[in-house]
């Protein structure tokens, strides 16, 4: 049975697509209304729409917007057109010229009486329907105008009324003439003047100037000047605001009366607005003002591929008001399209249904196995049951949704011309034409997806059609190759369907009896031929149709030179940075081994480690032909884990292609190109990224199956995760190379732990097998190594030890090695030197010296020599005899350090005593200094052997010191105060020696001085207290005798001052206490004086005080003299005036003691004259400075 005989309606009948302008004749409209399928979804949408529309008929509403959304091809434009017929209730004639209104076509399609009633209510309401595609009605550059929407609304509104649409100010003139009743008269006059009808000529506004002006002046109230002025200024003065437009529409509706409606039906408004917030704002204001002004009498219906919420969200501004106006929102889904096609095209007659049911029953399992897709494909519908098969045959269910995606992809990527049919009717036509092509095929035939190419070929861009045409004319290709090529084009932009061999075979199935295995072979052969002709490209497992531009780009990419070394380098980067990312192998929680990375013969990164991971690729193997034996030898020789990858070069080929693409893009990055080429470059960049993902996958698989060689053996590691396989290999390598790694069982993690180890109360180290130290084997290894090098006189540093034991066969950590060095150092097995100075365990920065980079190359390590017991005994004996200490350590360093502590303590005591010698002579200073010198000699020695030898050398010196220093210390403890008193008496005598002539005093002083100045006076110091007592008593007695005449002089001077003061009673109280206190002070000091010379000096001090006091009295008396006054005359009082300055004699007070100085001996008259002469001369000299001299 032929397929065409199965259908209920003739498959070859003429079905129009969406009716365009010029096709709206009754015949086409009749067929459109008659065959329109009301699906369940459409029934629901119609119910919602007419329910909302009814509110504007029966009442008032400002929610007068309808937003119809749906994907490309969902039938929204057709739905909008049908609504326009229903709202207008358009009347059409059938073939028999019987008039039928649009609503009546739906009497049997709408089974819901409520919906049908609402439809009839709308149809019975007079309505002006304005249906238009906004893109075709707007000016070419209108999108840049923020008022573009309202201008289009105004244009179509004017056209609906018969006014000029393209020139809005002419439409305003026409509207005004209609109001004035002059419009028909004007048109007749214009035609009479111009010879052309007004409707024909008004578009040529600027060529009909004279005719327009003359007609206006003759038929309207305008004069010729006024008409000319309007003509010249009309365009400049014209402006249409949204508010003015809304009012104009309202006035029109009100003028019509009888509940008249106007409906604007705008197709593709969503696409027109796009992401332009200015256009969205303009639409919002237009709809809002119309809603407010017209109250539901004017409606706006629009279509968009996006729902309104998405459009508002995309624009990102506040368009909440427009959402409120478009309260009715209808969304068409793909299920609606499927249902329409099934009912209009694929509906079967009874014979066809029976035939197909039997066919499905016999082949259902075959169909399930035949129609399969790869696992990475999105859901593709297949025949679910018998009814499904009957409804869809000869098509397959997945083809409905897939063809929609094809149409959308072609449109989005610009592969279609301007006239690719839109919406449900496009799919309808495609399915009808494909069915027609296979109409004569027998039952069992299935329509391959490639058949849909012919249905859209006429609408495709020439660049696509050219590729197919050239393929058809290519003698190296056959017809089936071209069909595969067409298929690859159709699914080129469908991401949900990878164009791999499995999917291509399913899409190319033409009959239920097809052998899919053979089909794949046939398709694969076609793909190979197409690839050779550069018509397609293989990307991984997918095949991609290439446009002419893409073919050109691919040829350029293919010619890009890529060095194989760069390919290997990039593969290495993927292996070592993506697949196996670890930079260190974690052998255990404590041991992480760094390793070198090599691929073929190319090192990746620095090669500074003892072990490595080496990858052998097919490229390297092809040039060297390594067999297993050679790889085993290589693994032993290089201390590497070696992985030989399988011979599959997929990842190498992919990487080569990636590098070619990158090279092409780099060269073209600064070159201007067409938009098509730029798009291809973007896709190529994306392709390179996809290939990178595949490289990762291919390399991972290769590593899973790679042969592994370690330490001259091939490992039997099962196929599993590459990281686990490599880690297993590294473990074997470490176990073999680092066979003494297990010597370390207790680990050090921080420098703090080293410090704690350093201060542990353990000094003895035993290297025997019974030692409890968990790391004894490791410590012994380090000790033996230091011993060997010291024996050979080789200098070794901390750095050298660390380097040695971090390598094979040890592999120990730096901090662990440092701990072993510390243990040996504390155990006195080794010595450490920094800048030729020996270090001790008490060094504050010892851990830094052993671990820090700044020091490890400077700290020298030597095996330590043992100190003899005899030398250690010397130190112990001296400790006992010199310092009286017997509790001492038994180890070399401990004993040395303890003895040094004793020496430091003694040195501190000596320093304290030596301070006493700074200002005073004391006995025993030489003993202390000699002892200090000996101590410092030992303290400056850090080397243990040198220290013990030096102690032996200074043994006698220390014993002598111990004997000599005892009386010195005793002196400072008990005798120093008596000694200081004696020295004080010597100093007193020395100061008064001139005045003291008594022989007894001199004798006492001599005895005291003999004892004090003796080198070792300690045994005679007990005599000093008696001598001091005798000296003090006699010295005081002599001093008191010397002070007696001085006291008399002081008293005499005091009386002289009082006599003078008593002469002036008016000032006595002023000076008395002051003078008395001054003289009492001198007397008191005289009573406490200790020296003769101080007592004698007080006599002169008293004389000077006397003179100063008398001067004070004289000055005060002079100051108190009254000023000169003038007497009163008559009524005038005495005026006090300053005294007249007159010559005044200068007075001077001189002590009598200063007139005659020295001792005078008078034996005769001449001597008397001489003395008097001396007195005279002195007085004369004093008179030179004063007129009056007063002797006191």
Swiss-Prot record:
Keyword Lipid metabolism found: no
Protein keywords: Antiviral defense
SUPFAM superfamilies reported for this sequence: P-loop containing nucleoside triphosphate hydrolases
Induction remark: Part of the brxA-brxB-brxC-pglX operon.
Entries under InterPro entries matching the protein: BREX_BrxC, P-loop_NTPase
Origin superkingdom: Bacteria
GO BP: defense response to virus
Task performed by this protein: BREX systems (bacteriophage exclusion) provide immunity against bacteriophage. A core protein of a type 1 BREX system. This system allows phage adsorption but prevents phage DNA replication, without degradation of the phage DNA. Methylation of bacterial DNA by PglX probably guides self/non-self discrimination. When the brxA-brxB-brxC-pglX and pglZ-brxL operons are transformed into a susceptible B.subtilis strain (BEST7003) they confer resistance to bacteriophages SPbeta, SP16, Zeta, phi3T and SP02 and partial protection to phages SP01 and SP82G (these include lytic and temperate phage).
Entry-linked NCBIfam families: BREX_BrxC
Similarity annotation: Belongs to the BrxC family.
Protein name (record): Probable ATP-binding protein BrxC
UniProt lineage: Bacteria, Bacillati, Bacillota, Bacilli, Bacillales
Gene (UniProt): brxC
């Amino acid at each position: 049975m032929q397929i065409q005989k199965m259908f209920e309606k003739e498959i070859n009948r003429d079905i129009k697509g969406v009716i365009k302008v010029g096709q709206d004749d009754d015949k086409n409209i009749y067929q459109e209304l008659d065959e329109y399928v009301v699906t369940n979804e459409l029934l629901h949408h119609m119910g919602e729409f007419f329910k909302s529309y009814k509110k504007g008929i029966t009442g008032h509403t400002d929610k007068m917007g309808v937003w119809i959304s749906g994907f490309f091809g969902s039938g929204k434009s057709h739905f909008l057109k049908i609504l326009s017929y229903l709202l207008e209730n358009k009347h059409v004639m059938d073939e028999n010229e019987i008039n039928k209104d649009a609503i009546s076509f739906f009497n049997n399609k709408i089974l819901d009486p409520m919906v049908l009633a609402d439809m009839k209510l709308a149809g019975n309401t007079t309505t002006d329907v304005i249906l238009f595609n906004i893109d075709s009605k707007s000016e070419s550059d209108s999108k840049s105008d923020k008022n573009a929407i309202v201008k289009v609304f105004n244009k179509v509104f004017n056209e609906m009324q018969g006014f000029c649409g393209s020139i809005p100010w002419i439409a305003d003139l026409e509207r005004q003439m209609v109001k004035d009743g002059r419009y028909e008269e004007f048109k007749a006059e214009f035609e009479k003047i111009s010879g052309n009808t007004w409707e024909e000529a008004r578009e040529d506004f600027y060529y009909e100037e004279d005719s327009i002006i003359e007609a206006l002046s003759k038929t309207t109230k305008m004069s010729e000047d006024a008409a000319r002025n309007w003509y010249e200024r009309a365009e400049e003065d014209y402006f249409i605001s949204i508010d003015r437009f809304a009012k104009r529409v309202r006035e029109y509706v009100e003028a019509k009366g009888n509940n008249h409606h106007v409906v604007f039906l705008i197709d593709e408004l969503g696409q027109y607005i796009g992401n332009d917030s200015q256009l969205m704002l303009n639409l919002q204001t237009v709809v809002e003002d119309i809603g407010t002004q017209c109250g539901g009498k004017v409606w706006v219906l629009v279509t968009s591929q996006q729902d309104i919420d998405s459009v508002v969200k995309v624009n990102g501004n506040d368009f909440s008001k427009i959402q409120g106006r478009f309260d009715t929102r209808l969304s068409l889904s793909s299920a609606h399209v499927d249902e329409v096609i099934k009912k209009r095209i694929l509906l079967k007659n009874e014979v066809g249904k029976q035939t197909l049911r039997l066919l499905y029953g016999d082949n259902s399992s075959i169909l399930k196995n035949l129609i399969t897709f790869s696992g990475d494909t999105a859901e593709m519908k297949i025949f679910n049951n018998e009814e499904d098969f009957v409804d869809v045959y000869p098509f397959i269910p997945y083809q409905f949704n897939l063809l929609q995606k094809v149409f959308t992809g072609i449109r989005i990527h610009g592969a279609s011309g301007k006239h690719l049919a839109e919406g449900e009717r496009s799919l309808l036509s495609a399915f009808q034409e494909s069915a027609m092509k296979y109409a004569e095929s027998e039952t069992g035939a299935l329509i391959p997806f490639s058949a849909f190419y012919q249905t859209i070929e006429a609408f495709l861009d020439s660049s696509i059609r050219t590729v197919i045409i050239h393929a058809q004319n290519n003698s190296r290709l056959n017809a089936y190759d071209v069909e595969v090529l067409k298929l690859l084009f159709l699914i080129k932009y469908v991401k949900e369907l990878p164009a791999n061999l499995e999917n291509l075979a399913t899409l190319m199935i033409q009959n239920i009896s097809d052998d899919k295995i053979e089909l794949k072979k046939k398709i694969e052969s076609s793909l190979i031929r197409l690839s050779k002709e550069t018509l397609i490209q293989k990307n991984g497992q997918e095949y991609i149709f290439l446009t002419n531009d893409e073919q050109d780009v691919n040829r350029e990419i293919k010619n890009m030179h890529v060095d194989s070394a760069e390919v290997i380098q990039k593969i290495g980067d993927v292996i070592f940075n993506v697949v196996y990312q670890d930079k260190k192998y974690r052998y255990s929680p404590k041991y992480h081994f760094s390793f070198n990375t090599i691929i073929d013969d190319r090192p990746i990164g620095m090669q500074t480690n003892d072990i490595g991971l080496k990858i052998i690729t097919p490229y390297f193997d092809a040039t060297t032909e390594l067999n297993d034996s050679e790889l085993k030898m290589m693994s032993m020789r290089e201390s590497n884990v070696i992985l030989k990858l399988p011979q599959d070069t997929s990842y190498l080929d992919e990487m080569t292609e990636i590098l070619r693409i990158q090279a092409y893009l780099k060269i073209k990055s600064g070159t201007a190109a067409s938009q098509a080429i730029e798009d291809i470059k973007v896709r190529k960049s994306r392709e390179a990224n996809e290939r990178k993902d595949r490289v990762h996958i291919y390399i991972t698989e290769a590593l899973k199956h790679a042969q592994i060689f370690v330490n001259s053996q091939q490992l039997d590691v099962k196929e599993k995760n590459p990281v686990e396989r490599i880690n297993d290999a590294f473990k074997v390598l470490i176990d073999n190379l680092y066979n003494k790694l297990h010597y370390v069982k207790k680990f050090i993690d921080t420098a703090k732990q080293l410090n704690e180890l350093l201060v542990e109360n353990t000094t003895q180290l035993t290297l025997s097998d019974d030692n409890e130290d968990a790391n004894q084997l490791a410590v012994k290894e380090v000790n033996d190594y230091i011993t060997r090098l010291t024996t050979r006189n080789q200098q070794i540093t901390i750095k050298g030890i660390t380097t040695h034991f971090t390598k094979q066969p040890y592999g120990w950590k730096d901090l662990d090695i440092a701990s072993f060095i510390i243990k040996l150092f504390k155990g006195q097995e080794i010595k450490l030197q920094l800048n030729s100075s020996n270090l001790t365990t008490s060094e504050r920065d010892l851990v830094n010296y052993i671990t820090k980079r700044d020091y490890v190359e400077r700290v020298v390590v030597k095996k330590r020599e043992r100190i003899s017991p005899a030398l250690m005994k010397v130190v112990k004996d001296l400790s006992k005899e010199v310092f009286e200490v017997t509790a001492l350590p038994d180890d070399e360093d401990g004993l040395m350090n303890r003895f040094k502590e004793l020496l430091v303590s003694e040195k501190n005591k000596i320093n304290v005593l030596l301070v006493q010698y700074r200002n005073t002579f004391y006995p025993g200073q030489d003993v202390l200094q000699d002892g200090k010198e000996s101590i410092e000699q030992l303290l400056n020695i850090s080397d243990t052997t040198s220290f013990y030898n030096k102690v032996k050398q200074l043994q006698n010196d220390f014993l002598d010191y111990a004997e000599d220093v005892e009386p010195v210390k005793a002196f400072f403890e008990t005798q120093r105060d008596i000694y200081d008193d004696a020295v004080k008496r010597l100093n007193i005598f020395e100061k008064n020696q001139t005045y003291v002539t008594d022989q007894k005093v001199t004798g006492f002083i001599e005895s005291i001085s003999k004892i004090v100045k003796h080198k070792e006076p300690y045994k005679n110091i007990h005599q000093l207290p008696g001598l001091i007592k005798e000296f003090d008593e006699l010295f005081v007695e002599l001093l008191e005798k010397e002070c007696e005449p001085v006291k008399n002089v002081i008293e005499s001077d005091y009386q002289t001052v009082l006599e003078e003061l008593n002469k002036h009673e008016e000032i006595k109280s002023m000076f008395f206490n002051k003078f008395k206190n001054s003289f009492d002070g001198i007397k008191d000091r005289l009573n406490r004086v200790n020296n003769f010379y101080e007592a004698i000096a007080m006599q002169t001090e008293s004389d000077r005080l006397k003179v100063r006091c008398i001067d004070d009295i004289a000055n005060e008396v002079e100051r108190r003299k009254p000023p000169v006054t003038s007497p009163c005359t008559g009524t005038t009082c005495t005026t006090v005036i300053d005294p007249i300055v007159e010559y005044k004699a200068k007075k001077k007070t001189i002590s009598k003691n200063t007139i005659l100085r020295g001792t005078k001996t008078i034996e005769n008259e001449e001597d008397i004259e001489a003395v008097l002469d001396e007195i005279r001369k002195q007085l004369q000299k004093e008179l030179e400075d004063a007129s009056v001299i007063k002797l006191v």
